[in-house]
Design a protein with these regions (language model features):
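Bacterial N-terminal signal peptides that target proteins for export
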Residues: 6-25
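C-terminal motif of bacterial Sec signal peptides marking the signal peptidase cleavage site
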Residues: 33-35
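Compositionally biased intrinsically disordered regions enriched in Thr/Gly
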Residues: 37-294
Length: 294
């Protein structure tokens, strides 16, 4: 049974802080330097050889393995797996590898849960549902979302929520830590987001039929979860997506919070938009030109 979770999700899995996260991607390069002397055989005394003759030559870096971003559909009595990738994303190999790494990690966790059953069969098939979607593509920015769930027993699946912000010109991922490098910036963002989320939950709860004491208790509980999940650290805001104008410049950042981070599971994935005017004074100088001004 595949659940479809609400749209909007950086790298966090279930109740844990970022898999997001974070995302596993990379290639191991092995450098081997040869040249050893036989044991037990004294080396003859010779004049020092010219540097050109004795300098070891580093081998060329190992070639990266080719990408294989094919959609996955598997269905048997023990597991149901569905993974889909956006078309053409292999144009950006570094980004594609990050997506592949995230999916591989999620699949590995599912397999680990299945291995824990031994020869037993789960009462319901374990499930991994993961969809990558390209949200934005400009010469400066490519943004991909990952949304889905992993079910390994219990009342419901673990939400899978991540955002990937790729800078094609720099060939690198843009992380929250790089974008806003100082504590003062995260304090400003934290205050703005927390207030927005508190106002939203207050509006929702005030429309429900509950007595004043119950309403106040619900508001206190909600405020406590929001405060815990929006503390002024980059880790709490690791999942974000830029919103841009028609020129491709960033006008706001949409921060994405999976279930349990700022509210109960029943509230689903939540988002908060922070305008460029709030963020820009704290953005690292290397990324200021990505933002709209005025």
């Amino acid at each position: 049974m595949m659940d479809k979770h609400e749209q909007g999700i950086s790298m966090k899995i279930g109740n844990n802080r970022p898999l997001h996260g974070s995302v596993l991607a990379g290639v191991v390069g092995v450098l081997v330097l040869a040249g050893c002397q036989r044991q037990g055989e004294p080396a003859p005394a010779t004049d020092a050889a010219p540097a050109a003759e004795t300098a070891a030559v580093d081998p060329a870096p190992a070639a990266e393995a080719p990408l294989d971003l094919r959609d996955v559909i598997e269905n048997n009595e023990r597991e149901v797996v569905g993974i889909s990738y956006p078309a053409g994303i292999d144009r950006y190999p570094g980004l594609a590898r990050a997506l592949q790494g995230y999916a591989t990690s999620a699949r590995s966790d599912l397999q680990q849960a299945l291995d824990g059953l031994g020869n037993d069969k789960p009462t319901m098939p374990y499930e991994l549902s993961l969809s990558f979607e390209k949200l934005l593509e400009t010469p400066q920015l490519v943004v991909v979302s990952a949304d889905g769930s992993r079910y390994t027993g219990g009342a419901h699946g673990e939400p899978l929520v991540a955002r990937f912000v790729w800078l094609p010109q720099q060939q690198q991922m843009l992380s929250a830590e790089k974008l806003v490098p100082d504590a003062k910036g995260w304090k400003a963002i934290s205050d703005f987001v927390a207030e927005q989320l508190r106002e939203r939950v207050a509006t929702r709860l005030s429309g429900e039929d509950m007595d004043p004491a119950q309403l106040q208790e619900s508001l206190r509980n909600a405020s406590r979860m929001i405060a815990d999940g929006t503390g002024p650290q980059a880790d709490n805001f690791s999942q974000f997506q830029p919103l841009t104008d028609d020129k491709g410049q960033i006008t706001a950042l949409r921060f994405v919070f999976p279930p349990y981070q700022v509210g109960p599971y029943s509230d689903g994935t939540q988002t908060a938009d922070v305008p460029a005017a709030v963020v820009l004074p704290h953005v690292a100088k290397d990324y200021v030109e990505l933002f709209a001004r005025g």
